[in-house]
Amino acid sequence: MKGYLVAIFLSSIFLYYVLYCILWGTNGYWFPAEEMRTRNNVNNCFKKPAFANLLRFPQLYPFLCRADFIKVAAMSGTNNFPLPYGIKTFETYFSSALSKLQSCDLFDEFDRVPCKRCVVVGNGGVLKNKTLGATIDSYDVIIRMNNGPVLGHEEEVGTRTTFRLFYPESVFSDSSHYDPNTTAVLVVFKPQDLRWLVEILLGKKINTQGFWKTPALKLIYKQYQIRILDPYITSEAAFQMLRFPRVFPKDQKPKHPTTGIIAITMAFHICSEVHLAGFKYNFYSPNSPLHYYGNATMSLMKQNAYHNLTAEQLFLNDIIKKKMVINLT
């Protein structure tokens, strides 16, 4: 009888182990954990991030890969929605663009830092005269966005860039800003963005129709440096971080997250610790600088009908107050 009970006990332990592996040994897309770690080139970080509960799929791979983006979309649900936050009806556009890229890798194969400290550097004027450059450069991963320059602002924002999120309308075209160590991540909002990427990589004449301003007519980054962000990240920024409605009233223009909020959401998926810099806006001073570069003022941002800066500031204040992230500015 005693041996029988021991056998039952051992069987229970084994069954628990199997169920544990099934439930926790895969990420939100049902990729085996070892496969995902290999794909990410990141070792396991056993420290649970402070922001982990914000994410539905904590181990989501942030970039699309041609070999499996259809399968991944079916798992995450982005196959049920058209652009800007899904791939429905535009699968061939994505496939065509992804086929022109040389890689969908996240980190360099030699990068084996298990728990990554990341800083997301916004473009806010609050960075002016802060001399945070050396501090920013000390992080494992540095995420920037759009055409926020490093050149000429090294003392304020540092010199290194790991990832730079961009749109066709906001990417650098001046080769003086080129950095061979940067991975440039396209955030897709419309089919024209994918068409633009194909045309620019093939050296074709750029069709500029359908953009809110003239897109870049040349790309300073090499083919191996380009990635396409999974629309799920943008969807998550809009619906889970900012709590935007999926359908806006007919008398309201739909609101979309800024590149900064999208960058923070991406950081939550690849980092164990996230710090922020340059995300504070002075709404009460319309003449205060909008960016740490250039002459634009806050009055310009207040005219933007496509973003909800109040919702974004509430979100940022909340995650800072709850110590999910650390704010450097």
UniProtKB/Swiss-Prot annotation:
- Provide the alphabetized UniProt keywords: Glycoprotein, Glycosyltransferase, Golgi apparatus, Membrane, Signal-anchor, Transferase, Transmembrane, Transmembrane helix
Question: Lumenal side: which ranges?
Answer: 26-329
The subcellular location is: Golgi apparatus membrane
Give membrane topology per the record: Single-pass type II membrane protein
Q: Which residues lie on this side of the membrane: Cytoplasmic?
A: 1-4
- Is tRNA processing given among the entry's keywords? no
Where does it sit, as one GO cellular component term? Golgi membrane
| Molecular functions (GO terms) | N-acetyllactosaminide alpha-2,3-sialyltransferase activity; sialyltransferase activity
Q: Which reaction does this enzyme catalyse, per its entry?
A: a neolactoside nLc4Cer(d18:1(4E)) + CMP-N-acetyl-beta-neuraminate = a neolactoside IV(3)-alpha-NeuAc-nLc4Cer(d18:1(4E)) + CMP + H(+); a beta-D-galactosyl-(1->4)-N-acetyl-beta-D-glucosaminyl derivative + CMP-N-acetyl-beta-neuraminate = an N-acetyl-alpha-neuraminyl-(2->3)-beta-D-galactosyl-(1->4)-N-acetyl-beta-D-glucosaminyl derivative + CMP + H(+); a neolactoside nLc6Cer(d18:1(4E)) + CMP-N-acetyl-beta-neuraminate = a neolactoside VI(3)-alpha-NeuNAc-nLc6Cer(d18:1(4E)) + CMP + H(+)
Set out the biological process GO terms recorded for this chain's protein.
cellular response to interleukin-6; glycolipid biosynthetic process; protein glycosylation
Pfam families from the UniProt entry? Glyco_transf_29 (PF00777)
Give yes or no: UniProt keyword ATP-binding.
no
Which InterPro entries does this one have? Glyco_trans_29 (IPR001675), Glycosyltransferase_29 (IPR051142), GT29-like_sf (IPR038578), Sialyl_trans (IPR012163)
Residue intervals passing through the bilayer = 5-25
Residues with glycosylation annotation: N129, N181, N295, N308
What is the protein's known function?
Answer: Transfers the sialyl residue from CMP-N-acetyl-beta-neuraminate to the terminal galactose residue on sugar chains of glycoproteins and glycolipids. It's alpha-2,3-sialyltransferase activity is specific toward type II glycan chains (Galbeta1-4GlcNAc) on glycoproteins and glycolipids such as neolactosides nLc4Cer and nLc6Cer, whose sialyl-products serve as precursors for the Lewis X antigen. Critically involved in the synthesis of functional selectin ligands needed for neutrophil recruitment during inflammation and lymphocyte homing to the lymph nodes.
Q: Family, per the entry?
A: Belongs to the glycosyltransferase 29 family.
UniProt-recorded name of the protein: Type 2 lactosamine alpha-2,3-sialyltransferase
Task: Please name the source species.
Answer: Mus musculus
